[in-house]
Design a protein with these regions (language model features):
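Juxta-kinase regulatory segment immediately upstream of eukaryotic protein kinase catalytic domains
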Residues: 2-59, 278-340
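Conserved ATP-binding subdomain of kinase catalytic cores across diverse folds
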Residues: 42-165, 181-189, 193, 279-280, ...
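Protein kinase-like catalytic core scaffold
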Residues: 81, 120, 141, 209-214, ...
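Residue-level marker of alpha-helix boundaries and capping positions
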Residues: 101-102, 173, 385-386, 465, ...
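Hydrophobic residue at the +6 position relative to the catalytic HRD Asp in the kinase catalytic loop
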Residues: 196, 201-203, 488-495
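Activation-loop N-terminal segment of eukaryotic-like protein kinases
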Residues: 203-210, 495-503
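C-lobe/activation-segment region of protein kinase-like
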Residues: 211-280, 507-574
Length: 591
């Protein structure tokens, strides 16, 4: 793909961006400023941008902070403004700005691209550039806040779910159409946003519930000499990745229909184009998910690797640092705390519920020690990950893929002094896992044994059907996202919140048996289905009709042959029989 930077469309008033007469020049130290006349005094003081003054007055808030840029919000009497401070932490960023101009200047100029095609966007009011011997280094872009607008992802996740169902459905429909119009206009003009996700789209809901959308982060906006349908397809996949996990197929279809209706031309084959978007979305999602899945392996803005004595840990930054150091000093101490509740004591593991400081507040957590079963266990960790690490990594994979599971807080491994174990002293002997406790929650096994039998027959039938649908959706979600759990059973599934709600929310625990395999082989699907089927065999009121209902919900009905369930039914039955006979031969009970 060939990208080119073209001159911005001419302004109707002939106004020059970042130049006189509308813009005034001011020098403060080594930072030169182009600022609109009516904003010069509110923004700039004798020493430049009034950041320290605003910080002292409590007007300054940090919205985003990273190695490459810091975003501030300042509430001024003239109105709220956002300040993007672009940093140059390495030579790569410095050379980039010397060749391609500063990000602040680029983003400011590209506002005209969108203005010319009727897409709302930010309005620059000041540009600051730090130069040393005429070479550009750090730079700033200041823009007023768009009134009553919030990022689209924040709106979809936090605000929209709290609205009444009828209004929520209406706004979702309007959102799909508005987003389709915005994207079609952008592509018709030959523009591609290389970071096209809802966080870079602002939304404001008008009085008639219709949304007004505005695009931000324009440094990622590119002009394509010849925008082909394959280019548009890949760009749509970037946006579709977010909604693929958070919206229904009908919403995505409505968006695509509106997008194609507004476009000035049509793809050669609409069906092939639509399937191509789904394929590109899945490929892009897998790339992102695997990248996010590696976050738990070292130090970054989400996790911190720590070592003290003969123990080391990778802990979430949400867990208080003092808690982590206490665990490194004595990993077994939480089991002896006064508030600790032992949940399980066995040859393979010890599990307790206790309290730790998470995000500055006390929270109940699940603390699990994976015991050493054999003297060879430390040596085996040299060839394969320990059970605690497998569960830790699986939890991160599931969180990255938006599969419900308790939040990972810390992984701890304890070694031995050389004098105690001259052979394996440097390898993990005991490993520990800390996860946030889901509350309120009950395991599906406990609910099936203690609650279901006491319900009236009609209520029990309805509850069994509700649980069946929820289980099928959960397993389909796992498999669609390339995850397999060989030990998926009722005791490893939590029911979150009230069990009387229409849609039951489920969560998966005990993730030692979870594996990431892409693409997921068919035999893995059958094994997971058969394991869950055996675990549900003794649920009161569950019939073979419920098993069929589960299978039909699990299969993407309408996207697979209508008789495909028969072959899968026979394969599950055969795998269940083999599992039952094997456990009987080994003298192990099914659970």
């Amino acid at each position: 793909m060939i990208w080119t930077f073209t001159k911005p469309p001419p302004n109707p008033r002939g106004e020059r961006m970042f130049g006189p007469p509308e813009w005034q020049w001011a020098q403060a130290g080594d930072v030169g400023w182009w600022v609109r006349a009516d904003w010069q005094h509110p923004l700039l003081g004798p020493e430049g941008l009034r950041l320290d003054e605003w910080r002292g007055q409590g007007r300054l808030a940090v919205i985003k902070k990273g190695p490459h840029r810091v975003v501030y919000r300042v509430d001024l009497p003239e109105g709220a403004v956002y300040i993007k401070h672009y940093l140059v932490p390495s030579w790569r960023e410095k050379v980039r700005q010397w060749i391609r101009r500063g990000k602040g200047r680029n983003e400011g100029r590209r506002t005209r691209y969108l203005d010319a095609i009727g897409i709302p966007t930010i309005t620059p009011i000041a540009l600051g550039e730090q130069r040393k011997r005429k070479f550009l280094f750090e730079n700033y872009l200041v823009t007023p806040a768009i009134p009553d607008a919030v990022p689209l992802d924040e709106f979809v996740e936090d605000r929209l779910p709290t609205w009444p169902p009828i209004r929520r459905a209406r706004v979702r429909r309007y959102l799909a159409e508005a987003l389709g119009v915005l994207t079609a206009r952008m592509h018709d003009a030959g523009f591609i946003h290389q970071d096209f996700h809802p966080g870079n789209v602002l939304v404001r809901i008008e009085a008639d519930d219709r949304p007004t959308l505005a695009m931000i982060d324009l440094d990622a906006l590119r002009v394509c000499r010849s925008l082909k349908w394959s280019h548009a397809q890949r760009n749509l996949a970037l946006l579709n990745h977010y909604f693929w996990l958070r919206s229904e197929r009908t919403d995505r279809r409505r968006f695509l229909a509106c997008y194609l209706r507004v476009r000035q031309s049509a793809p050669p084959n609409v069906r092939v184009f639509a399937r191509g978007i789904e394929t590109s979305t899945r490929a892009w999602a897998e790339l992102l998910w695997r990248r996010w899945g590696k976050r738990c392996q070292g130090t970054n803005k989400y996790f911190k690797k720590l070592r003290r004595g003969f123990a080391w840990s990778i802990a979430s930054r949400d867990l208080a640092r003092t808690e982590v150091y206490n665990l490194l000093d004595d990993p077994d101490a939480p089991f002896l705390r006064p508030d600790a509740v032992l949940l399980k004591v066995s040859r393979t593991a010890t599990v307790a519920e206790t309290t730790m400081t998470v995000k500055g507040q006390p929270a109940r957590v699940i603390y699990k020690r994976f015991n050493r079963k054999k003297w060879l266990d430390p040596l085996l960790t040299y060839f394969r990950p320990s059970r605690a690490w497998q569960a830790w990594q699986a939890g991160q994979h599931m969180a990255s893929r938006a599969v419900p599971t308790p939040t990972n807080l810390a992984f701890i491994a304890r070694t031995r002094p050389f004098r105690e174990d001259p052979l394996f002293w440097y390898l993990p002997h005991e490993t520990y896992l800390v996860t946030l406790k889901a509350d309120p929650a009950v395991t599906l096994n406990e609910y099936a044994r203690a609650v279901l039998p006491k319900l009236p027959p009609d209520d029990r039938r309805e509850q069994v059907r509700t649980i069946t649908r929820a289980l099928a959706r959960l397993l389909r979600m796992l498999h669609e996202r390339s995850l397999s759990d060989r030990d998926l059973k009722t005791s490893n599934i939590l029911i979150l919140g009230a069990t009387s709600q229409e849609v039951i929310r489920l969560s998966v625990i005990d993730l030692v048996g979870v594996r990431l395999i892409h693409p997921l082989p068919h035999h893995r699907r059958v094994q997971n289905l058969s394991r869950l089927h055996l675990s549900l065999a003794d649920v009161p009121g569950r019939t073979r009709t419920d098993a069929l209902r589960f299978l039909r919900t699990y299969l993407p009905w309408g996207l697979t042959p209508h008789n495909d369930w028969k072959r899968l039914w026979r394969e599950i039955e055969a795998a269940s029989r083999i599992k039952r006979e094997r456990n009987l031969h080994r003298g192990r009970e099914l659970s």
